[in-house]
Amino acid sequence: MANNEESRGLKSLFDWFANRRKAGATNPERQEREIADGLWHKCSKCGVLTYTKDLRANQMVCVECGHHNRVDSDERIRQLIDQNTWRPMDENLRATDPLQFRDRKAYSDRLREMEDKLGLLDAVKTGLGQINSSPVALAVMDFRFMGGSMGSVVGEKITRLIEQATQRRYPVVIICTSGGARMQEGMLSLMQMAKISAALERHRDARLLYIPVLTNPTTGGVTASFAMLGDIILAEPKATIGFAGRRVIEQTLREKLPDDFQTAEDLLKHGFVDDIVPRTQLKNTLSQLIALHQPVPTTPPMVLWETMSLSSTAVE
């Protein structure tokens, strides 16, 4: 009897949460307070309230409409890398201000504010780990740090990661999300495009796999360099991917662009990406691709006369 009452009580509680999520809180002030406290998350696409714990369990993908919310670098690593296998690289690299750049505030002040607010030294985390027991070199960009912009530190960390992967014969996976090259570093940021591309070319010459994953947004100098140099290019659903911004292109061409312009779906249709993979399937997809492209062991070739000698011995 007690068990039945307990079951009915739990069912009522679950029904209340379900109705609350669909209908929204009746008191706007209470709703905003609970969202601010992090208990609930309001989807920016469909407006449905979801319990934050449930959203995280679904890898920050809305359970109602499938909208892929942005995730930070730590969360992305947790989603992809096997537990207790992550070994970060170059954690202490930090940007300087060689140009003494200043817009509304000094670049050095911006860097300090980002570090204090986020606990990050720059816009990418790199390291070695395993995806379903397969070794991998992984770089994860973080849009929270100055829009994921690519400066000297981002370029150096990714280049070092690729060089380490080439030496160890590891595949490379880069989770891309960026507004492009960092304007506060001028030409130094643009140099990173060529620097990373050269490292990837050496990695490719070693016949090793590179997979970029394009997430929302991937634009500017990142798109114009390593984001589009993959052996297999993956993208998340509805991700904005392009070089110049939509408004800039419309003003230049004086034309209205299609609604799906610069979306992952449009790029797939025109052959710029190879597949669109939902975040909840990304780890297994990467694991399968890595397993299919395991590097062939480098063994010294057998010279012709040795082959003939072995054949003669077999005949005798």
Swiss-Prot record:
Pfam families registered for this protein in UniProt: Carboxyl_trans, Zn_ribbon_ACC
Superkingdom assignment: Bacteria
GO cellular component: acetyl-CoA carboxylase complex
C4-type zinc-finger residues: 43-65
Pathway: Lipid metabolism; malonyl-CoA biosynthesis; malonyl-CoA from acetyl-CoA: step 1/1
GO molecular function (one): carboxyl- or carbamoyltransferase activity
Cofactor binding mode and count: Binds 1 zinc ion per subunit.
Subcellular location: Cytoplasm
Top-rank EC class of the record's enzyme: transferase
Positions contributing to Zn(2+) binding: C43, C46, C62, C65
Reaction catalyzed: N(6)-carboxybiotinyl-L-lysyl-[protein] + acetyl-CoA = N(6)-biotinyl-L-lysyl-[protein] + malonyl-CoA
Domain CoA carboxyltransferase N-terminal: start-end pairs: 39-308
Keywords assigned by UniProt, alphabetized: ATP-binding, Cytoplasm, Fatty acid biosynthesis, Fatty acid metabolism, Lipid biosynthesis, Lipid metabolism, Metal-binding, Nucleotide-binding, Transferase, Zinc, Zinc-finger
Gene3D superfamilies: 2-enoyl-CoA Hydratase, Chain A, domain 1
Essential cofactor(s): Zn(2+)
The enzyme's E.C. designation: 2.1.3.15
SUPFAM superfamilies tied to this protein: ClpP/crotonase
Gene Ontology biological process terms from the UniProt entry: fatty acid biosynthetic process; malonyl-CoA biosynthetic process
GTP-binding in keyword set: no
PANTHER family for this protein: ACETYL-COENZYME A CARBOXYLASE CARBOXYL TRANSFERASE SUBUNIT BETA, CHLOROPLASTIC
Subunit architecture: Acetyl-CoA carboxylase is a heterohexamer composed of biotin carboxyl carrier protein (AccB), biotin carboxylase (AccC) and two subunits each of ACCase subunit alpha (AccA) and ACCase subunit beta (AccD).
Family, as annotated: Belongs to the AccD/PCCB family.
Name of the protein in question: Acetyl-coenzyme A carboxylase carboxyl transferase subunit beta
Source organism: Nostoc sp. (strain PCC 7120 / SAG 25.82 / UTEX 2576)
